Amino acid sequence: MFTKNFEKISEDKKQMIINKGIKIFSEFSFVEAKTDLIVKEAGISKGLLFYYFDNKKNFYLYLLNYAVDLLTQNLECKTTYYDFFDNIFSIMDKKCNLIKKYPNETKFLNMASKETSKEVEKEIKDIFSQYHKKSNEKLKIQISNSIKIFNLRKDIDHELVVDALSLYIDAIVIKHLNLYQDNPMDLFDNYDEFKNSIRKYLGLMLNGFLNTDCLR
C-alpha cells in the first residue's frame, strides 16, 4: 500500500489525519465519504491526500487496518485456573474496554461490515477475515488454558473441546451483535446482561441437557 510518504510526516499530524479520517468513515460509507469532505475535515489539500495515499481507497484501507490493530491489541490475559468463567470473561472485558476506548474505530468497523462498494468489498472481506482469525486465536488460547481446571474424560480430545467452546462462544457473540447491529455501542450498555447470557449458554453446554439414560 502506498503510504511511505505518509509515514515521513510528524506523529502529531499523522494522528490528526488518521483520527479525522476514521471519524468520517465511521459516519459515512466509502462512496458517501467524498474526497472533498475528507480533505476538509483532515485539514489537508486533495493533492496531499493523493501524495500520502495515492487515492481514497488506499486511505480507507489504511485506516481500516489501523482500526483493526487498535481493537485487537494486548488481548493476552493471565489465566488464574481457579474459575472458568472469570478466565473467559477476562479477554472479553479487555475487548470491551478497547471498544469503549476507541468508539469511532468501532463504529468504523461496523460501517465497513455493511459496506456495499465493489471497489473495496474484497479488501474489507480479507481484512475482516484476518481480524476474526486473530481474535479467535487469542480466544482459543484463553479457552485452552481455562479448561485445565476441568477433569476431562480421558477419551475427550482437548483440541476438540477448545474448538467446540470457541464456536459456541462465537455464535453467542454474533447473536448479540445482530441485536445491536444498528447501534453496536449499545451492547456495552447491557454488558452484564450479555455476560450472563454467555454464562447460561456455556453452563448448558458444559453441564449437558439430557438425562443420562436418554441416549441408551
Model-assigned labels for residue ranges:
Residues 12, 16-23, 27, 41, ...:
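Alpha-helical structural segments
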